[in-house]
Amino acid sequence: MASLANHPTSRDQAKVMNRYDITKRMVGMLHQDEAVIGGIGYTNFDLWAASDSPHGRRQQNFYMLGSMGLAVPIALGVAIAQPFRKVFALEGDGSVLMQLGALSTVAARAQKNLCIVIMDNGAYQITGGQATATGQGADIVGIARASGLAQSAWAADEDAFVELICRSLKEDGPWLIGCRIDNQKPVDTTERDPARIRDRFMRGLGVRK
């Protein structure tokens, strides 16, 4: 396993990137077998926008509505249920902070096919931009490492983000990738139909026709 020593050691050393841009880059690297769980808020909205294509919307995405902090637990459950499938959790810093216990659970389980991507803008943007703990000194990647997730790293910039996603697709995890992002509004808004989101995702995982 290659070292992560060349990546930033703290949040302040990472470049501030655009959420939609890096989400689009990640989705573009995926095939049709990886599952992606989008947490609530603008992270979710940009995943929705980035996953549309002339061939239709990506069925292997699940868009969480209304409940904070559940992208990582849901992704862990999918990864356990389908260990042959790479599973990604996309979550904002505020939601991760709400469910910090999930990180130690992921570390204890050591699920090899799981990657967590944290979009960290230091704010609860969708509710008015109130500062999160990461905006006041907390380092979510440092917290993840202390929780037992050794393969945790800040993406220094867009190229480093692509490199880390590529490694997570090829190497065993669990992985956690921290991304400092800007406060730009999302490109689109996720559809508000929970049953349709569920059914499409289940078809994408091959558990429903």
Regions found by a protein language model. Name each.
Residues 35-40, 63-64, 89, 153-156, ...:
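General beta-strand structural signal in soluble alpha/beta enzymes
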